[in-house]
A protein has these predicted regions:
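Glycine-rich beta-alpha loop elements in corrinoid/cobalamin-binding modules
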Residues: 1-30, 238
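Radical SAM enzyme core and accessory elements
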Residues: 12, 250-253, 259-374
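Basic phosphate/pyrophosphate-binding loop/patch that engages nucleotide-derived ligands
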Residues: 9-17, 218-227
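Core catalytic loop region at the nicotinamide-binding pocket of NAD(P)H-dependent oxidoreductases
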Residues: 15-20, 95-97, 293
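Flexible glycine/acidic-rich beta-alpha junction loops that bind and position SAM and/or redox cofactors
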Residues: 58, 107-109, 168-173, 203-211, ...
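Structural detector of well-ordered beta-strand residues that form the stable sheet scaffold
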Residues: 20-21, 133, 198, 229
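Hydrophobic "lid"/C-terminal helical patch
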Residues: 5-12, 85, 119, 282
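Radical SAM [4Fe-4S] cluster-binding motif and immediate context
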Residues: 30-198, 205, 209-218, 246
Length: 374
């Protein structure tokens, strides 16, 4: 919108605004202004956002990022990031900040030499007012210096597209950073550096065997990825996957656009009913209290936070804790597993008790979402 919004506003003022505005060039995000946070009530938000870069150097068949933002990451200058952090701080924001990049580590050199050192200095000067989280490819695990800098800057969580434990499916979708890799070891290494891994998983690839649903469950449980976002493969318009399926006459007239409702917009090789049934089984299993709480324990055994900030517990957090204890500890069917985890955390990992409770509460939400899948 950096390039076309001024054109729209000019036409709007003249009373001749068009329905669609397009640009042939990628916008220069070095010209992106600092958001006017004063336009919203910051107290109504649990986290807020900053964007450092756009674009991703990889070309996965199902992904439309390179269509929307290109495959050559474009970044802001460190002065822009500092200015945006200042703006949030001056508005009184304290808490989570999500770097909403397509792939935060798309330009590692600049990130390590300029951007992260600037964030580290800023956050130390301000006494660690924020915790950061972002999205990155699995090859983050290959760069210990980068993981160390992210931890020092205050990053404590990262979303990673795992997609599938099936090597043939990774080859099929051209998921280059995931191929020929011990994905389980990579996840545990990232978490060892104090970065909680949230994982994205996909079922429905042509190369998926019928055993893929069990394989996904097994991998998720062993990895300790507490927040495992499993979806059915979708073919967004203009992607290479969309074009291939169109040529194979496998596209369906329309799709919901929601890859977590069990539906898709093409005819899968394993059959639509088999895929939908298997997907629901995966989601129901991984978010059942027993399996979900076991993953929290696995995660906490691996997790070694390195940042200097402390998890701050607010009055709202305490109220949520009391309410959740009543619902999860007394009313829910899986309450025995709840109390086992609470006792285990207090005995084995007491310093992680606030984090454990936060993950427990999130799990309740995930179960409610899973129940809506038909």
């Amino acid at each position: 919108a950096e390039d076309i919004l001024p054109l729209f506003l000019e036409d709007l003022e003249k009373g001749c605004a068009k329905h669609i505005y397009t640009s042939e060039e990628w916008p220069d995000i070095k010209k992106t202004p600092v958001p006017l946070w004063s336009l919203i009530d910051m107290k109504k938000y649990q986290s807020t956002t900053i964007q450092y870069s756009r674009g991703c150097p990889f070309d996965c068949e199902f992904c439309d990022i390179i269509i929307l933002n290109g495959n050559r990451p474009r970044t802001k200058d460190k002065s822009q990031i500092v200015a945006e952090l200042d703006a949030l701080y001056d508005m009184g924001w304290r808490g989570g900040v999500f770097f909403v990049d397509d792939n935060f580590i798309g330009n590692k050199r600049k990130l390590k030499s300029e951007t992260l050192p600037a964030i580290i200095k800023w956050t130390e000067d301000k006494k660690h007012p924020f915790s950061f989280f972002t999205e990155a490819s699995i090859n983050l695990a290959d760069d210990e210096e980068l993981m160390g800098l992210m931890g020092e800057a205050g990053f404590d969580m990262v979303f990673v597209g795992i997609e599938s434990p099936n090597e043939e499916s990774l080859v099929e979708c051209n998921k280059l950073p995931n191929k020929n890799r011990d994905l389980l070891a990579s996840v545990k290494k990232i978490q060892h550096y104090g970065l909680q891994v949230q994982g994205g998983f996909i079922v429905g690839f042509d190369s998926d065997p019928l055993s893929i649903f069990k394989s996904q469950i097994d991998f998720i449980q062993k990895s300790g990825i507490v927040t495992a976002m499993v979806g059915v493969l979708m073919a967004p318009p203009q992607t290479r996957l969309y074009q291939r399926l169109k040529e194979e006459n496998r596209l369906l007239p329309k799709g919901s656009g929601d890859n977590t409702d069990g539906s898709t917009n093409f005819i899968p090789k394993m059959g639509r009913e088999t895929l939908a049934r298997g997907y629901k089984h995966v989601v129901d299993t991984i978010y059942a209290p027993k399996q979900y709480y076991e993953r929290i324990k696995t995660f906490l055994r691996e997790y070694k936070p390195g940042n200097k900030g402390k998890l701050k517990v607010s009055l709202l957090d305490l109220i949520a804790l009391i309410r959740s204890t009543w619902v999860l500890g007394f009313k829910e069917k899986g309450r025995i597993h709840y109390w086992k985890l609470v006792v285990w955390t207090l005995l084995k990992k007491p310093k992680f008790f606030p984090l454990s409770m936060m993950l427990i509460i999130q799990g309740f939400h995930f179960r409610k979402v899973a129940e809506k899948i038909r």
